[in-house]
Amino acid sequence: RLPGSLVQPNDKNTAIKAALEAGAQGLIFPMIESREQLDQAISWATYPGHDDGRRDGEPLRENRGVGFCRANAFGRDFDAYMRDTAPRIFLVAQIEHIRAVEDLDAILSQPRLDAIMVGPYDLSGSMGLTGQFDHPDFKAVMARIHEACRRHHARMGLHVVQPDPGELRRQVAAGCRFIAYGIDSVFLWQAAARPAGV
């Protein structure tokens, strides 16, 4: 079961802090292209001592401010939140650029990372193949991502933009463990395009 998660700007400490203080139990960092970007985003989402993604010899770099807020019932549940909830915030890196694929082994080796999610339109666009999901080069990149996730025992998610049950089954069979299926606007225009049946 995926906790309630918010997509957060990965370069905005204040937005990440605000989402967590409001009670979000998961964050999706968009457009992560490198391990360094991911480390920075995770540092803003974790309290000192809660990030086990440090490389040997690195100092503590967690930057989440500590205070009473909605997430810890304005202090009433502070100790329980710090002990039980904060260390388990579900953290997802969106893979939306070919540069991220080039650094994927480093990204997937971040111990605090819980999953990645592929944004196929942006990823294909970064390859000069916007929306060409059947192109051999795009398929090869997707296979490379799946293989890297298997190698690192990492959870992989995907946005299946067009609601296609066959594609959904294929992606689950390929190993995707969570899928954003469709977009509200796509569901609406597809439903509106069907005959009324009256």
Name each region found by the language model.
Residues 1-198:
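Expand to "…catalyze enediolate/carbanion chemistry for C-C bond making/breaking, isomerization
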